[in-house]
C-alpha cells in the first residue's frame, strides 16, 4: 500500500466523505461508522483515553454534542468509560476492541477508496497533496479556534 495514501486518509476524512469512494459492504448490513464516530474514535486511538471535556475542547464543539455522540458509541460498544488513568475525577472514554475493529475496517475502506481516486498519481504528487491537505486542515482548525471574524 502506498504510505502517502495511508497518511492522507485521516486528513481527507476531515475534509470530505464522498459516497463514490466507499465500497458497499460485502455483508450488505452497512455497519459503517458515521463521520463523527470515525473522527472521535480516531482521536481516542491517537491520544488515548479522553474525557468529554477534553474531546469537546479538541474538536471545538459543545460538550452536549460530544455527550450525545459518546452515548451512542457507548451503546454500540465502540467505547467504554474508565476512571482517569492519571487519577483525575473525570471519567474518560477509551476504545473497546469492537471500536478498534470497526475503526480499522472503516479506515481500510477509506484507504481503498483513496487508492482508487488517486490511481495513476505519482508518489510525489500524492505526498504533495497530503501535505497541502494537512496544511489546509490546520488552517481551518486555526481559524475555528479564533472564532468568527469581526463584523
What are these language model-derived features?
Residues 1-36:
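N-terminal leader segment of winged-helix/HTH proteins
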Residues 3-11, 105-151:
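Terminal interaction helix/tail motif
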Residues 30-37, 96, 122-123:
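Short helix-coil-helix linker/hinge
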Residues 39-45, 101:
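Pre-recognition alpha-helix immediately N-terminal to the DNA-recognition helix
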Residues 47-51:
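Short capping segments at the starts of secondary-structure elements
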Residues 64:
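Key DNA-contact positions within bacterial/archaeal DNA-binding proteins
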Residues 71-127, 131:
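Charged, amphipathic alpha-helical coiled-coil/dimerization segments
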Amino acid at each position: 500500500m502506498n504510505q502517502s495514501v495511508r497518511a492522507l486518509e485521516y486528513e481527507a476524512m476531515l475534509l470530505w466523505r464522498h459516497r463514490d469512494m466507499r465500497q458497499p459492504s460485502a455483508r450488505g448490513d452497512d455497519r459503517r461508522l458515521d463521520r463523527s464516530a470515525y473522527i472521535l474514535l480516531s482521536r481516542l486511538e491517537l491520544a488515548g483515553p479522553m474525557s468529554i471535556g477534553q474531546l469537546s475542547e479538541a474538536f471545538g464543539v459543545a460538550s452536549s454534542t460530544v455527550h450525545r455522540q459518546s452515548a451512542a458509541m457507548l451503546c454500540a460498544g465502540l467505547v467504554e468509560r474508565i476512571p482517569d488513568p492519571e487519577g483525575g475525577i473525570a471519567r474518560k472514554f477509551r476504545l473497546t476492541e469492537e471500536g478498534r475493529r470497526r475503526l480499522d475496517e472503516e479506515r481500510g475502506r477509506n484507504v481503498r477508496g483513496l487508492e482508487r481516486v488517486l490511481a495513476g498519481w505519482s508518489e510525489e504528487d500524492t505526498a504533495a497533496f497530503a501535505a497541502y491537505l494537512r496544511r489546509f486542515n490546520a488552517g481551518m482548525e486555526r481559524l475555528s479556534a479564533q472564532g468568527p471574524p469581526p463584523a
